[in-house]
Amino acid sequence: MINIEHVYFSYHGDREILKDVNLEIKDGESVGIIGANGVGKSTLLKLLVGIEYVNGGKIEVEHTNVCKKNLTQIRKQIGYVFQDSDAQLFMPTVLEDVEFAPLNFGYSKEDARKLAIGTLESLNIPHLRDKSIYHLSGGEKKLVSIATVLVMNPKTIIFDEPTVGLDPKNRKIFIDTLNTLNCTKIVASHDLDFILDTCTKCVLVSQGQIKAVDATRNILTNQQLLEENGLLLPLSIHR
């Protein structure tokens, strides 16, 4: 369970990026966060994992306040898949990247390796284990990025613009993978068709505030609501 209550945020005292944001995300939900550029979607994700901290209000993950003193506990429960996979993959090989988190959290080398291999197998990419990240396709990098997070078995995984740079084939593989993950998923994306395919609940953000929370199809078929907030209907709805 994630509770966001009366959250305000600004960078270095500048204009407010988020204003009185309230949201509850239940265990097991697949939640899409949508909105035009610069409305605060990515900022909200960063607040959830403690990359940034609220200026006012509070965020609780499993009844634990997201703050510096609780950061290790929070990051055991929430995984974050960056928009740019290259920012997340930095070890010489795929296997070393995936076992990095368990090692960092105190697992033995043997146990970390077992977890890493098992995670790669669960995503059907064990053949990539000894490859350099520089020899991976965009789709492969995205799957390995998921593996680096999934290896710790978090209750929640956050995805920031996950389809950026994916061709149609790898996009389909990624959608299929996402839909098999047995955890809470929070996805921020401009790809509204992707949100429609992967999320059952949708949150519309505009000018730093939540304008609507509803079933995904209810929001993404509401042309007036979308256009009022700088968005267009998903392509699949036009067909």
Task: List each language-model region with its residue ranges.
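Helix-to-loop junction immediately C-terminal to a conserved catalytic motif
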Residues: 49
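A short, surface-exposed alpha-helical micro-motif characterized by mixed small hydrophobic
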Residues: 195-197
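Conserved ABC ATPase signature
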Residues: 132-136, 140
